[in-house]
Amino acid sequence: MIRKVAAGFLAGIALLPLSASPAQAASGQPQYRALWVDAFHGGMRSPQQVEKLVADAQRANINTLIVQVRKRGDAYFNRSIEPRAADIQGPIEFDPLEYLLRLAHGAAPRIEVHAWVNVYFAGQTSLVYVQQGDTWGNRANDGATSGFLDPGVPEVGIYTQRVFLDLVRNYDIDGLHLDYIRYPGVTWGYSASAVALYKLQAGVTRTPGPADPKWQAWRRARVTAFVRDLRHELKIEKPSLKLSGALICFGGGPFDASGWTSTSAYNSVFQDWRSWLVKGYFDFGVPMNYDSDWIDQQKAWFDRWIAFEKDSGFANRVVIGVGGFLNYPEDTLAQIRRALSASTVGNRVLGVAIYSYASTSVYGSDDFYGSPDLASGLPRQPYSGGITNQSGLAARAGSFNSLFMTQLSHAASYTDVQLGSIATQPVFPQPAPVPDPR
């Protein structure tokens, strides 16, 4: 998942949940209220973290947890053909995914659990990359490597599909959520076996350049074929399973369908997610609309992308992703409201997903704990208050992340060192069931 770096803290906070007024009451209509839970931070490494995660989701009226269970060719679940993640805490028999499923499915109301898996990114230290990287590893046209596996290598797709089907067979997950389902960029795809296969299928002898249109189309088709074939196998294995994916939305979005082929998703990382949604390869897609609302250009980017997502014929297969880690809390809430509102022609999406549980705002992110200079781009500079040690900053970030769970479902306020008390209004004041995207 692509993250942009932001920074900033508050000197003090006030956790002041207030009473929601009747006018703020939600309709209770089905709506995805999802939360990404990444494995690079705490969230499900220990039994205590899992218990807190479910309690926080209930407090926030979150009804879907998208939990990262395959980070770098590893597993946050015990019954796996890949190695158990090294940072799982507790006894060896503790199974993070199994315990989360038990608590989330037993919650009232029930919380869905979608297993988030990195597809082509494995990391250069993962077992699969160490063992197979020489032949399966993706390479740039200059020979560089970055820990990605190459979609153009048939064995990569076979192995990865096997990992995912094994997960679905062993755990009662509600959905499978694909991330890094793409190339790293336009100059990638040059593993020897992928280039050899392209030459054979295209009937050419020369190695293509990165901008060769046929070579670009071939790489794009490799990614699409993996998604299509995986869906086919998953629906045989478990028809009720929901397949989704984290989708690229770099820069400004298209104004309509005619502009789709000019996007970075389509022509740079070869992720033709518009066709996946139109053809129903995904039950729903989650475009990563990660933009800072306090930057005018990025705010415009966000609004253009969500307009495209609502009015291009596949709104019934879209859950809009918002980047809390790039925003002040009140701005994230504003983005959620805009995402959930009807378009100018009356179209609505299935819901929203928030990135992320560990970084709910620029005050809750750890991207910049050791780098106060990274806060220089923020319009409000809350990097005062005397806390300079890592543990103190982490504790303050944790307090903000906890507060945000309250802000989602209750009126609340917090204290900013420059603006004083800032009041927020909830976006999920009542629980809501998940919709059926099919």
Q: Where do the protein language model's features map onto the residues?
A:
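Substrate-binding cleft of secreted/luminal carbohydrate-active enzymes
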Residues: 270-299, 305-437
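Polysaccharide-binding and catalytic clefts of secreted carbohydrate-active enzymes
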Residues: 56, 138-281, 288-291
